[in-house]
Amino acid sequence: MREILPGIFTWGSTYADRPWDLNGYAIALHGCTVLVDPPAPEEGDWTSFDVLKQIAKIVLTNRDHVRDTKVFQTRYGAHLVAGTDEVTQLAPLVIDEPVRESDLVADALRVIHLPGKSPGEIGLYIDPAHHAVSRELGGILILGDAIIGHPPGALGLIPEQKLDNPAKLKLSLRKLLDYNFSVLLLCDGQPVLKDGKFKVGEFLNTLANY
């Protein structure tokens, strides 16, 4: 696990059937840590997690990003957070905190509902009003499967056959431009550490042509 930004850590796993890395994030907040879409610890390195502030919540952005959540939940007793419309999609996993558009998770992470890949997919905007690092960097956005960092150095969508409603997803992605952000942390593929909103805007313009 490495510190990708001050107080924000990332780690990942590689799978033979995926041409991109699967990333998890740990966000250190006042009094607790929130995990997002956690894959297995690299080489079983639990020490890096044990030294963090209390891991109080695990956010699942969508039904396909459960990954190693149960292992983390068992070890740390964290509550599970997911979009309200994704709760049934995640069964039999029990979601402790269903969230909707604009809800605030752990007093810092603003929920963005992004349906299309699945009914209740969410993104997280680290609200600059509640987070000093996000404020200093011009905003931080975290996405699960709504947009991925593949091919390397570019943005893309997961294969269309895995999308419930491609047209709905493309429409819902437009709301990302309502937020100010420079950093784009992706749970699939390479993150974008500067000019994130500009690159998302460029990507969405290419989608409009299809």
Walk through the language-model features, giving the residues of each.
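Short, exposed beta-strand/loop patches in secreted or surface proteins that constitute
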Residues: 1-3, 26
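Structural motif
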Residues: 3, 17, 47-51, 106, ...
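Metallo-beta-lactamase
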Residues: 6-9, 15-17, 32-35, 41, ...
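Pre-active-site segment of Zn-dependent metallo-hydrolases
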Residues: 10-57, 90-91
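Residues that act as N-cap/strand-start positions at coil-to-secondary-structure junctions
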Residues: 19-21, 99, 118
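Residue-level detector of beta-strand structural context in well-folded domains
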Residues: 23-25, 101-103, 122
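Active-site HxH/HxHxD metal-binding segment of metal-dependent hydrolases
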Residues: 40-107
